[in-house]
UniProtKB/Swiss-Prot annotation:
InterPro entries in the cross-refs: Ser_deHydtase-like_asu, UPF0597
The protein, known as: UPF0597 protein DP0591
Pfam family, one: SDH_alpha
Protein's GO biological process: L-cysteine catabolic process to pyruvate
Family: Belongs to the UPF0597 family.
Signal sequence coordinates: none
GO terms assigned for molecular function: L-cysteine desulfhydrase activity
HAMAP family in alphabetical order: UPF0597
Amino acid sequence: MKFSVKNILEMEVCLALGCTEPVAIALGAAAAATLLPGLKFDHIHLIIDPNIYKNGLAVVIPGSGGLTGLDTASALGAFGGDAYGKLEVLSSLSPEMVARASAFLAEGRVKVDLREESGLYVKTTISGGGHVAESLITDVHTNIVSLMLDGEEVADPRLVATEAMSTGNKLAELEEWLRSLTLEDILDLTNELDEADLDFLEEGVQHNLRLAEYGLKHGSGLGIGKDIDRLLKQKLLVKDMTTSARMLTSAAADARMDGVNLPAMSSGGSGNHGLTAILPIWAIKDFIETDRESVLRAIGLSHIITAYIKAHTGRLSAVCGCSVAAGAGATAGITYLVGGDLQQVEGAIKNILEDLAGVICDGAKAGCAIKLNTAAGAAVQAALFSLQGVSVKDTDGIIGDSTRQTVQNIGDLSNYGMVATDKTILKIMRAKHKKG
């Protein structure tokens, strides 16, 4: 089956309020809660996969007043989530809703269990008023495949995907098609972007810029972006392409990981991927002669490359997708924008994958801003090196003789080579959580 660039944007690029893993938990709880209108909840039981656990454990939830936690995300979704809002499920949280969820949590009414099998999985069971409601999300953060009340399936076409319309099934088909593409095919797709697509891409820029501006103004989270700005003013750093990309991208991550109530335009199922795929390209445009259309086409290319690599590595894994997938997307977009040809775009992708392939994902948290800072800077560097004729040789390590082969190798590293790494990361994080 052949897809179009519009299909990629529709399925891979969307607004997300808050980190997508706790948001998926909130969505599952909100969906189950719709089956118990007006009833007092007695208990919530959550069963999740290891990577949802890892990415949802420590990140601040928007609108919560600084709260974190898997159980918190579930309670907030149940008491204040809009099940029809998808990744913006928590956009209407009020202080009263947060207070009710907090009281529910304080009474120990939420239980979280870990599913050993990998693959995105969020099962939420809510009991109340003598009834039991259940939702199940699989494969994709918004893909509700089942809603049940007292053991009976509930049909809600606005919430529950049929097998034919399942986001998970459609995404699997899209990813299979993406894996068949060459870099030349991907560059051709960029030429198919029409004015409506460019407007949508520009909307994503504006959303992610708002996060960056907030981070720069308030020093949210770790304050990496604001600190870079301070170092520039102290003349300890020089404002160039690399520093500008790092500052803008990390500032947005600072704000997002601190739970600021502003949505991000996500890419490949992750808001932080969206920040990395978009903002470095936007930052470097001021250093070259270019125009709106060229910048937005470069960002479109970045999203496609991000989706292409995620189709190989998997939605969630031990590999930091901001570094490997969105970082590669950004460097491809930068190279394209500065005037690079097919060979130079390929060289830039090889450069950044050689540089950052070993960066692990140890969950979403404030420290992600440091990783996005690194990815943004490396994306600029990899592009500039390639434009100067410097690219990693095909004989080096995991680098292949083409972008396709290199990305396949990264996929093997992620899906097979780092399984034990992922388990070890999770073991360390769970031990810390139990101590806390």
